[in-house]
Regions:
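Mature secreted bioactive peptide module from preproproteins
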Residues: 2-109
Length: 109
């Protein structure tokens, strides 16, 4: 299941980013979230494993980072924080999502 999430700059409304996330893995072992980010037809991928952060972006104007952590006391919930940091002028955009992961690997949120 793929759900669209939207990350946008509310100050200008001109740079709109669509984030799609998909979950694979096993809650008893590991959980991997892949976020696919589109901007100006350039795509980048953020892969999250455990609490580590990895990012790749071919958009020269932004650095995209993301972090995933399991919600304390709830092994079936993850918190994803996505940061969009402009390398020039402008404000950083930070969005946090709490998502539920079910044993079949499907993401709800």
């Amino acid at each position: 299941m793929i759900n669209p999430l939207t990350l946008y700059d509310s100050a200008t409304e001109t740079r709109r980013k669509n984030i799609y996330e998909d979950v694979t893995g096993d809650l008893l072992g590991y959980c991997v979230i892949t976020i696919k980010y589109f901007y100006n037809f350039d795509d980048a991928y953020i892969d999250l494993g455990g609490s580590s952060t990895r990012w790749v972006s071919n958009d020269p104007d932004y650095r995209i980072t993301a972090d995933m952590t399991f919600v304390s006391g709830h092994d079936d919930h993850v918190k994803v924080t996505v940061r969009c940091v402009p390398l020039g002028e402008g404000s950083s955009i930070v969005k946090t999502y709490t998502l539920s992961v079910y044993p079949d690997g499907e993401l709800k949120g």
